[in-house]
Amino acid sequence: MELKTEELKYKTADNDEISAFLAIPEDNNAKHPGIVLIHEIFGLDDHIRDVAKRLSTQGYVVLAPDLFTSNKLSQTITKDGIMKTMNFIMSIPPEKQRDEAYRAEQMAKMSPEDQKAISGVYQTLFMNRPTELLTQYLSSAVDFLNQHPSVNGKIGSIGFCFGGGMSISLGCTGKVDAVVIFYGENPEPVEKAKNVKNAVLGIYAANDTRITSNVHELVKVLAEAKKPITIKVYPNAYHAFFNDTRPQIYNEKAAKDAWRMVINFFKDNLQ
C-alpha cells in the first residue's frame, strides 16, 4: 500500500505544540481507523517512524508524537540529553539494564557535562515523570486524529517501554478503543485501568522482571471491570526486544510473533 507521510505539529489543550510524524494510507480518500503511536524514552526516532509506516500499510492513519518537544518539556529534555542517554543505555548489557548500582558505576566514568545531561533526562523522565501532562498531550493527539478527514472515528494506541506505560495511561482516559502495551509500567494507581474503554493487549519480556512481575495487578483490575485483556510474556526476551535497531536486545522471533498479535488485535478491535 502506498503511503503519504508528513512531519507536523499539533496543538495541545494548554495551547502548546507537539511535533509529530503522520503516516496515511493513500487509497482514494477512504477513511481509516487512527492509531496514536508512542515512542520509547528516547523520543521520536527513525525506528518509531518505521513502525508508524508498517502500521499504516495495514490500513491505519498513524500519528507518532514527539512528546518531549513541547515548550514546557524541551527546556529540560534536550535532543542532546536524549541522545547521550540513549547511547549510555545502549552501552549497558541486557542483563544489567535494571541494575542501578552498575548504571551509577558506569556514569561515574563519564565527563561532568555528560553526567549532567543524562541526569537531567533521568530526573525528569524517571524520577519525576509528568505523567498527567504527557497524557494530556496524547489526549490532544487523539483529538487531532478524530478531526482528521482520513480517520473514521475509531482510535487505538500503542507504545513501547516508556510509551507502553503512556499507552495504558491514555487508555485510562477512555478516549481510545484499543490499547497495546509493549513492556510498559502499570498506571498509577493501577485501579485507574477500570476506566479503559475496551480491549487491552499487553506484550512483555520474561527477562524484564521489574515490569513483568506487576502485570498480574493490571490483569486483576481489568478482569474485575470486565474489560478484555490478552497478555503475552516472551521467554528468553529482554525489555525492548522489539527494537531492531538495538542488536544486543532485539529478539527477532519474539518481535515477529508480537507484531502478528498487534495486527490481529487492531483488526479485531478497530476495523
Language-model region placement:
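N-terminal cap/leader regions of alpha/beta-hydrolase-fold enzymes
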Residues: M1-Q271
